[in-house]
Amino acid sequence: MAEAAPEIPPENENPQREPWEEWIGEILEEIKQEALKHFDPRLLTALGNFIYSRHGDTLAGAGELIKILQRALFLHFRAGCQHSRIGQSGGGNPLSTIPPP
């Protein structure tokens, strides 16, 4: 019985993905800009300082800040932000403009 040839992983010919740290930084900046439209900048500064005191300048800290800001924005929109149709009665469904099949 002949031995099977060793498995060789395929060569990765795709373009290299952008670095994780750069992607996290871009996402954090986008969420921060959106949060500044809806929350007091002093609150966001205090939150950033709190996260920094717990995690320092790490990816874990950036991830934690992203998670908290996403939740805060979601709850803010659900509560009826005046800039959003989410959570408001009569706001309408944005998908209703798509004709049915």
From Swiss-Prot:
The modification Phosphoserine is found at residue 84. InterPro entries: RetroV_VpR/X. One of its GO terms (cellular component) is virion component. It is found in: Virion; Host nucleus. Keywords: Activator, AIDS, Cell cycle, Host G2/M cell cycle arrest by virus, Host nucleus, Host-virus interaction, Modulation of host cell cycle by virus, Phosphoprotein, Transcription, Transcription regulation, Viral penetration into host nucleus, Virion, Virus entry into host cell. The gene is vpr. The keyword Phosphoprotein applies. It comes from the Viruses. This is Protein Vpr. Interacts with human UNG. The keyword Transcription regulation applies. One of its GO terms (biological process) is symbiont-mediated arrest of host cell cycle during G2/M transition. Stimulates gene expression driven by the HIV-2 LTR. Prevents infected cells from undergoing mitosis and proliferating, by inducing arrest or delay in the G2 phase of the cell cycle. Cell cycle arrest creates a favorable environment for maximizing viral expression and production.
